[in-house]
C-alpha cells in the first residue's frame, strides 16, 4: 500500500566469545564451518528474518575470541534477553553472546574501532597439556619471559611490519601502530599481550614465533629490532600456531558506551 510506513530499523552490537578450534575462521565460507555462519543462523532464528553481521576483526582458522564485537541491523524489536539468552540457546556450545547494546546509526564494528587487542597463550612445560590443548600453544623448552618482553619493546609505535606480515596479506600498507606489547609469566603460562590500531595478516603469530626464539635463547634480544628494520619476512621465525591466539578486546570511542567485560581467556587471571 502506498501510504504504509516502513518498519524502523534497529542497529545492535554484540560481544561474542568463541572457541575457534573447530572452525575455519570467522568469515562465512562455502561448505566449511565458520563462526559467522553459526552466529547469523542463530540471530536469524531469533529475529525471524535474515541477519548479516559485521565484525571488528576476522580471525583465522583455529583462533579464538573472548572480545569479538559485531553489529547487525534488524527490523525485529526484541528485548535484550532475546539477543543474549535467546541467541545463545540457538548457538553451538563453543560460541556465546556476552553482551548486547543498541547503537546509533553511525556505529560500525570494524570501522568505528580505534584499537584491537590480542593475547597469545603459551603453555611452557616439558609435558603437553590435555584439557587446554586447543586453547594454548605448547612449547616445551624453558622460556625467559622477561627477555622476550625486553626484545619486544622495539615494536612499539608506528612501524613497517613487513617482516611479520603474511605473504598473502591483502592490506594496502604494512604500517601499523603498536600501543603496547607485554610478555609476562603466570606459572607455566607465558602470555604475550599486544594492542595496536590494527594488525596485518598473521602479525601477532609471526611476532610470537620470533619472540619464542629469543625466549629460548636461540637468538639475541636485539634480533627482533633487526627483523623489524630488515622488512623481510623470510628472515623471521616460523608463524606460531593458531591455538594460543585470542582476540580479547576491541576499543571504541567512549560515546558508544559499549560494555567492557573481563578480557580473558577466562582460565587466566585478568
From Swiss-Prot:
Its EC number is 5.4.99.12. Substrate binds at residue 118. The active site is at 60 (nucleophile). It catalyses: uridine(38/39/40) in tRNA = pseudouridine(38/39/40) in tRNA. GO terms for biological process: tRNA pseudouridine synthesis. This is tRNA pseudouridine synthase A. It is an enzyme of class 5 (isomerase). It comes from the Bacteria. Keywords: Isomerase, tRNA processing. Belongs to the tRNA pseudouridine synthase TruA family. The gene is truA.
Amino acid at each position: 500500500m502506498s501510504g504504509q510506513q516502513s518498519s524502523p530499523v534497529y542497529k545492535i552490537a554484540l560481544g561474542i566469545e568463541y572457541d575457534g578450534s573447530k572452525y575455519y575462521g570467522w568469515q562465512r565460507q562455502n561448505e566449511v564451518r565458520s563462526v559467522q555462519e553459526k552466529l547469523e543462523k542463530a540471530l536469524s532464528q531469533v529475529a525471524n528474518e535474515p541477519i548479516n553481521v559485521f565484525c571488528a576483526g576476522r580471525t583465522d582458522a583455529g583462533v579464538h575470541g573472548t572480545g569479538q564485537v559485531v553489529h547487525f541491523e534488524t527490523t525485529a524489536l526484541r528485548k535484550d534477553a532475546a539477543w543474549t539468552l535467546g541467541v545463545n540457546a540457538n548457538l553451538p556450545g563453543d560460541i556465546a553472546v556476552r553482551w548486547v547494546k543498541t547503537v546509533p546509526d553511525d556505529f560500525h564494528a570494524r570501522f568505528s574501532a580505534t584499537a584491537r587487542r590480542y593475547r597469545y597463550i603459551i603453555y611452557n612445560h616439558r609435558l603437553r597439556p590435555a584439557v587446554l590443548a586447543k586453547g594454548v600453544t605448547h612449547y616445551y623448552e624453558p622460556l625467559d619471559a622477561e627477555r622476550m618482553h625486553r626484545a619486544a619493546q622495539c615494536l612499539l609505535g608506528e612501524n613497517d611490519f613487513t617482516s611479520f606480515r603474511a605473504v598473502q596479506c591483502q592490506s594496502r600498507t604494512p604500517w601499523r601502530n603498536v600501543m603496547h606489547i607485554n610478555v609476562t609469566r603466570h606459572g607455566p603460562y607465558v602470555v604475550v599481550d599486544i594492542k595496536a590500531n590494527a594488525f596485518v595478516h598473521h602479525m601477532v603469530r609471526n611476532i610470537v614465533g620470533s619472540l619464542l626464539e629469543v625466549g629460548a635463547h636461540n637468538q639475541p634480544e636485539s634480533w627482533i629490532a633487526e627483523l623489524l628494520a630488515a622488512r623481510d619476512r623470510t628472515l623471521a621465525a616460523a608463524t606460531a600456531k593458531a591455538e594460543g591466539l585470542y582476540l580479547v578486546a576491541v576499543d571504541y570511542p567512549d560515546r558508544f558506551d559499549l560494555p567492557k567485560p573481563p578480557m580473558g581467556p577466562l582460565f587466566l587471571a585478568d
